[in-house]
Amino acid sequence: MSSEGELGIEVVYALPGQQTVLRVELPAGSTAGDALNASGVLERHPEIDLTRQSVGVFGQIVGLDTPLHNGDRVEVYRPLQVDPKEARKRRAARKAS
């Protein structure tokens, strides 16, 4: 549990077959970037490239400078493997045949 003036934050990164959930305590006023750095997720998963990957809080994409609130979950999103528009076309073509 967080003491007053501290934020209890979860940092999450998911791979196929593996999910990393790290809990950190940060001072009030900390940002999404602070949480990523404090959690060690970037060292644990060196494949994370924040110049290509988005970060979010509870499914909403945010910047690394976004202030956090107690109980927030910071998520690192992997790049899409297939364009969603192309995937819909493929499914429609399979269904039609």
From Swiss-Prot:
InterPro entries given in the database record: Mopterin_synth/thiamin_S_b, RnfH, RnfH_sf
Range of residues in the leader sequence: none
Pfam families linked: Ub-RnfH
UniProt similarity note: Belongs to the UPF0125 (RnfH) family.
UniProt-listed NCBIfam families: PRK01777.1
HAMAP family: UPF0125_RnfH (MF_00460)
Protein name (database record): Protein RnfH
Organismal lineage: Bacteria, Pseudomonadati, Pseudomonadota, Gammaproteobacteria, Chromatiales
